[in-house]
Amino acid sequence: WMSSYQIFSNITGCFVPGMNYSKIEEVLELFLQTITRRLEENNFYEIPPFRHYEEKCRNSINKILKSYGYRLNELEIDEFYKMVIAVLFDETFFGAAFKISGYEKKKYRKYEVMISRILDAVLEDYNDNVREFLQTILTVWLSDKVKVKSKINALILMHGEHSASSMASLANEMIGDYVYEAFDMPIQVHTEDLIVKVNDYVRDIETNEGLVLLVDMGSLER
């Protein structure tokens, strides 16, 4: 009898320190094939811990992606779930020091944002190494499953707990693409604080194609 941790022992060994996003993409298919083979050989699909994460993935992924204008099919959700459990249940996992350039971080940023929200919903109490590893490989994986077509970044800033987020989500869903991001501003926010937040955002994105800011001017300080 093999435990749920032993079945995935050393499965993350195909990822080595120093990999960038391109190198990670090259080994993802092998990683998925190895996961599937081990699951089938040991008939472990139905054990409670695996089923628990499968349900969390199926209940969360498309609800979150909908607000960005996308959805995954059942096979893609299955792939996502398999990668999550493989990393969580690899008893030999120690992390990998990937080397992601600033250029790649900007290029893949929107995929990273989506994966971060999904992992917030799916993961429980796991250490930073596990979270960071999954964040990186799943960001690369998602970039092959959904395509962000818009090259222009657009940011909505409004006062209210969810006002900007709701507007951005609805617009992205109608467009069918991740165009708008949102800053929901507290009622008492100062203009200086807002400027700092926008500047931090601009540093993290690619602005060669332009940036659109939609601001609720009526609620800003004069």
Q: Residues of each region from the PLM?
A:
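A cross-family "folded-core" feature that marks the main globular domain of proteins
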Residues: 1-222
